């Protein structure tokens, strides 16, 4: 434990300097980026509403409602949400004073399908008519005891006080008729429509369903980027244009660095959302230098597992992300190298769910990298037996809840497989590299400042004329971790 603590103490000093120095923000670029994405968000909203209206008829719909999204995508609605959640063990519960997600019941596909049909009903397209009871006002009058009519101030039962009656067309099923194949596709309100599920559904959808799901993924991303990054930066940048984000070492369970005000550690990739271009040098003629590790978590998993095939692939210079993309594409799911990264990482943590092509890839991964698969079994056994795992750095992880459940599955298996890889990669290796780079820059008397560390990359605000020196410090500091 002491080696890990020593590193974190040294890293803490580096972080205080990074917080104090901050990073310069180009507010004009931030404004332009906001306008660009607000326009795209408006266009996406119009397109999504058009697609939803075609699929639902006149049924009211909100893009931000989980229940509406569930109804639209899967064309079904639970009869009773409490009974639905109880039948599948969905939702959250308090565990030792902390609210956590429940573990859904495991069941076979046939049993799952039967329960879904029994506990939910098909949704049909509707046509809207003005209510003939309240004439569209939503309010009705009542006759007084003396026989006269009072003012229309009571809610209309016929239309639910909205003034409109929605008549279903039982010959036309509403929505996009997607079918949930596993219990992970369900949620307490009906069906899951989070980011991962939408992306997964997009792969097998066609026509308007595919168009809607694809646009919805982008809509959610843009909404998140605007709220978290653009507004987050704008609300926290100082009058001098410097953003002093707050770094935190003791928040994530794996030990990796996190930040707030704003959160810069969930920043999207530059090609996906160019928020990084608003970070500029504080010096005229200066530049931003960014260096990162290549395929770090895959390499860490290979080293921890002593997987000979994985180590050979690394030595041979094989691009594992490109190969992941190739395997998925050959299986019928066209995938770019960038989009393939999440699938490369997923089996490192024992992930197996997904589309048919993704499941084929995960099987291929397990058969090729048997060392990693065997290591997973080993650490699961250790976690169950000792409730604890320790990394080579001395960083310990406690799993007091680890036990073998029904069907031989280990409770919390994903976390047990995930924490050592992510923790050793971004909780130990990258902080050591950051300390090394910081010390090298200080020894050389450089004016340049280290301003951020995001996952497996280190970012430096480079003073004019120090470009080569900074690059050498980054290279030497990041590679010297192996020493």
Q: Where in the sequence are the language-model features?
A:
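Glycine- and acidic
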Residues: 19, 23-31, 215-216, 278-288, ...
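Conserved "right-hand" nucleotidyltransferase catalytic core of DNA-directed polymerases
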Residues: 1-270, 283-287, 363, 371, ...
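A common structural junction motif
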Residues: 475-483
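Short, contiguous acidic/charged loop-to-helix segments that flank catalytic cores in large enzymes
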Residues: 146-147, 201, 229-238, 270, ...
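Short alpha-helical scaffolding segments that buttress acidic/His motifs in well-ordered protein cores
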Residues: 11-15, 213-220, 297, 301, ...
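Function-dense linear segments that define catalytic or interfacial modules
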Residues: 245-333
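Catalytic palm subdomain of template-directed nucleic-acid polymerases
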Residues: 17-41, 301, 352-356, 458-475
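Conserved catalytic core of nucleic-acid polymerases
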Residues: 13, 20, 128-157, 164-165, ...
């Amino acid at each position: 434990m002491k080696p890990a603590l020593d590193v974190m103490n040294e890293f803490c000093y580096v972080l205080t300097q990074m917080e104090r120095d901050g990073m310069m923000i180009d507010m004009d670029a931030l404004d332009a980026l906001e306008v660009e994405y607000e326009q795209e968000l408006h266009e996406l909203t119009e397109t999504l509403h058009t697609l939803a209206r075609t699929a639902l008829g006149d049924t009211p719909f909100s893009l931000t409602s989980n229940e509406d999204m569930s109804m639209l995508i899967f064309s079904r609605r639970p009869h009773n949400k409490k009974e639905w959640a109880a039948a599948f063990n969905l939702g959250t519960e308090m565990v030792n004073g902390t609210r956590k997600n429940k573990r859904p019941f495991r069941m076979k596909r046939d049993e799952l399908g039967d329960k879904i049909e029994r506990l939910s009903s098909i949704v049909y397209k509707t046509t809207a008519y003005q209510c003939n009871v309240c004439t569209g006002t939503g309010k009705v009058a009542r006759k007084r005891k003396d026989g006269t009519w009072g003012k229309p101030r009571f809610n209309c039962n016929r239309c639910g006080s909205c003034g409109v009656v929605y008549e279903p067309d039982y010959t036309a099923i509403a929505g996009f008729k997607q079918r949930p194949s596993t219990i992970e596709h369900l949620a307490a309100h009906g069906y899951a429509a989070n980011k991962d599920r939408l992306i997964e559904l997009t792969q097998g959808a066609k026509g308007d369903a595919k168009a809607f799901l694809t646009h919805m993924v982008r809509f959610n991303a843009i909404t998140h980027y605007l709220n978290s990054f653009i507004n987050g930066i704008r609300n926290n940048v100082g009058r001098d244009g410097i953003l002093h984000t707050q770094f935190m070492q003791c928040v994530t369970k794996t030990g990796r660095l996190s930040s707030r005000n704003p959160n810069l550690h969930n920043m999207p990739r530059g090609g996906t959302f160019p928020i990084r271009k608003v970070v500029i040098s504080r010096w005229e003629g200066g530049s931003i230098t960014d260096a990162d590790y290549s395929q770090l978590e895959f390499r860490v998993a290979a080293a921890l597992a002593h997987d000979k095939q994985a180590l050979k692939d690394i030595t041979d210079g094989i691009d594992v992300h490109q190969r992941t993309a190739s395997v998925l594409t050959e299986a019928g799911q066209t995938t770019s190298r960038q989009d393939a990264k999440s699938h490369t990482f997923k089996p490192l943590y024992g992930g197996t769910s997904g589309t048919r092509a993704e499941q084929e890839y995960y099987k291929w991964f397990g058969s090729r990298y048997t060392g990693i698969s065997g290591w997973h079994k080993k650490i699961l056994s250790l976690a169950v037996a000792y409730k604890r795992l320790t990394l080579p750095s001395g960083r310990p992880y406690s799993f007091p809840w680890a036990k073998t459940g029904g069907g031989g599955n280990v409770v919390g298996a994903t976390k047990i497989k995930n924490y050592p890889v992510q923790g050793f990669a971004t909780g130990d290796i990258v902080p050591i590299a950051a300390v090394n780079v910081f010390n090298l820059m200080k020894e050389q008397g450089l004016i340049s400042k280290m301003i951020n560390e995001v996952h497996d990359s280190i970012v430096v605000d480079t003073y004019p004329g120090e470009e080569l020196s900074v690059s050498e410090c980054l290279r030497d500091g990041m590679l010297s971790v192996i020493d």
